[in-house]
């Protein structure tokens, strides 16, 4: 129960420090806070910040690195004070609320040469909320299939049905075909399957809805996908994966318990450092009509609307977003890069990364936009994970779960129309 006190203390410290953000010598002091904190990541950010300070000797940057579990809460509390913060990490699920509260500055792009070097995806996500650049993404999270090449797979599965069949063949004794995610975040995987099974009828811009305005949960294809989701758990996955979250499903693969895993590119580094040596990657499986859908996770750097040094804050955001720095950050964190120049870098076009390039070049591997700006989004994240647990343990049926989700998102559509 001490977290709120720590957060308030952090905010108070920044408020007090913010009173002296300049100096008589003309030196400008910026305060910057990260969200997805880890020791190696913080070390890399400090290196990039040191390069910025070297190039701008009149600007000094203080980096605040809160613990990962409470970072977003602390950032929000600091933003509420509207003092003592200049640059911050903004995530895909915080940018909407931060901008709605007026905490984020609109970043200039027309006079910044680095804008034209950003990939089309980076430019699109920078202005995804309200059509205004409240952040510059530093990289993207997109799922791919990791699989063991020494477990009898001649070729990686290209459809969910093939994944199920391959997983059954791999499952024997204490080895299982698939790293299932039944715990927190598990509902996202069944939604991904349902999306693939709905195929071309799905509206990628509003990915919980079809082009005819019905929800993706209302169709016979949704029933097929959900039933297969349950079969993949029961027949190809470890029984305790009913409660697995991100760490457990990754560990299941790297420890040799499972032969397949679907996860983000940050796992590449984890697998490379593990004892697993015979593995590869492939684009995520498709549905019966040949389509695969997934959202792209992202985060980036933004400037506060109340910064006492807006020009310098923007300068730091732009520096971190330019090719050299952004590519270094993407490499250090196993992210899909934002710079066009990275496309010629061997790290992002060979080996485990090749699957991401293949997916980007496949018109039927479609990027979607989740309804994160709908009022019920946060509640659905909680409710849907609970429903998946009930589904996997036999407390709810496929029909009951889909009926509930269909009703929820039908109602949500009325609230935003």
Model-derived features: positions:
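Conserved N-terminal structural module of periplasmic/extracytoplasmic solute-binding proteins
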Residues: 2-97, 112, 242, 288, ...
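Extracytoplasmic/periplasmic substrate-binding proteins
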Residues: 35, 227-312
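Periplasmic-binding protein-like
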Residues: 44, 171-173, 317-340
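Hinge/lid segment of periplasmic solute-binding proteins
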Residues: 92-144, 155-158, 162-164, 189, ...
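Short, solvent-exposed loop/beta-turn-alpha elements that line the ligand-binding surface or hinge
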Residues: 109-119, 199-224, 272-274, 286-294, ...
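Long, aromatic- and glycine/proline-rich binding clefts that accommodate carbohydrate-like moieties
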Residues: 121-127, 282, 331-383, 390, ...
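Extracytoplasmic/periplasmic solute-binding protein
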Residues: 130-138, 143, 162-215, 258
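Glycine-centered hinge/linker elements that transmit conformational signals in sensory
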Residues: 167, 211-242
